[in-house]
UniProtKB/Swiss-Prot annotation:
Pathway: Aromatic compound metabolism; Xenobiotic degradation. Inhibited by methimazole. Induction: By 4-NP. Disruption phenotype: Cells lacking this gene completely lose the ability to grow on 4-NP, 4-NCA, and hydroxyquinol. It comes from Rhodococcus opacus. This is 4-nitrophenol 4-monooxygenase/4-nitrocatechol 2-monooxygenase, oxygenase component. Pfam families: HpaB, HpaB_N. Belongs to the FADH(2)-utilizing monooxygenase family. Optimum pH is 8. The gene is npcA.
Amino acid sequence: MRTGQQYLESLRDGRQVYVGGELIDDVTTHPKTSGYAKAIAEYYDLHLDPEHQDVLTFVDDDGVRKSMHWFLPRSKADAARRRAYHEFWFRHFQGGIFTRPPAGMHVVMYAQIDDPEPWGDNAVVAGGRTISFADNIRSQWQRVTTDDVALSPMFVDVQFDRGRDDALVETPMLSIVEQNDQGIVVRGWKAMGTSLPFVNELLVGNLWRPGQTSDQTVYAIVPVNTPGLSLVCRQSNATPDADPYDHPLSTIGDELDGMAYFDDVFIPWENVQHIGNPDHAKWYPQRQFDWVHIETQIRHAVHAELIVGLALLLTNALGTNNNPIVQSQLADLVRFRETCKAFAIAAEETGFTTAGGLFKPNNIYVDLGRAHYLENIHNAVNQLIEFCGRGVVMSPTKADFDHPFLGPKLEEALRGTSISARDRVSIFRQISERYLTQWGARHEMFEKFNGTPLYLVRLLTMQRTEYQVDGPLTDLARQVLGFGDTEALAARAAEVEKNSNWASVAYQPEYAREQDVRDGYYKETEKV
């Protein structure tokens, strides 16, 4: 395990990082980026703190103590241990304001190290070369876990023309432009990654789209300081010069999302995981992100808990907590939180062991839990804001409270039920920045789209479960109706169709003409 200082030193490697059009010389010191870099340095240091050793670390098979972000669960107890680990970080980072610490990104490799063979078996390599991609993945895993490398996955491609399947070949997405005995050369864009300026290596891949070509199918690990690689990040929402009382979240930092441009970047074969087969991109990446979504579900439960806590503190401070209507609304928030947590526990309780020996929480309950969160989070946040009333907008600043004339008067006017004015306003300011600012809007958009949008979560649920007409969920209904199994239903339908007039003459012009004549729609002309 490395220290926070070692982590910061690893970021001073000549990387090309642009934030809001500005080239950042040193992400560890620049005001737009230093806050988050320091937060992740603290992340690494806390792993070395003996007080948190049992929660944040484990001892591997060789007797080496490592960070839990490399821990491969092999039992239900291991899955619960990982949940406790993720919960620690989401609580530490203010209820999940940083959505992609290293703990949330390294899991992308879990599915690969669990079952590396298909990544090589499915590959298509030019020139008759034989590359052992499975061995590459094993070596990469050994290296990144030993060196405690910070990774960020980049699988999303640029939004070009999504109205045509054949438009994908025209996109400037990342593609292979050359294969040789040493490796591959790639050119183009990867469209989305989180915490890009603050990691050591990118794990690039694809989420399949219609029309994807062989050259566009690339999975590899790429160091961030590789020549020709540029990171283009969105404008930072960090406010390093503000007072933490006024901006309790953005003063901590901004994890930053960005794009990556590869200008004829060389990737040696040992860093490549798979190339050449678009069909591979249809299924295996989803298995990778199943592990990410487990972490996402845990974050959702922690965030829901924060909303409940803020609501209880707020309504108590306002003196509205005993109002029957408010109590009913608070009960809705509590139910939201408990349901989110219940899905996480259900996923663990009904998990299964993979072919590679990992214990994987049931992805169906993970997806159902994510859908429940996305369907209800807006109502929960809106309810919290309604509890605030005008206070969430009319909140004095620290300078107002510190003013010799205004301060005492504000303290008197804004005091609450057994709470000082400053503390009461701090609740409003937390809610305001978290949900009503550009900083908060980015967080909302991340949760809405990072783990696939809601409609796709629902679609995946239907594709990956027995929720089908011939599945076990229709057993009781068929029994009640006396239908028997689906084969019996189909046999009866075929028998009826075979003996029916409408089936035997379907689409026959003679039959259709007879009906028209019979019903007076058509009059036969007499032959002369």
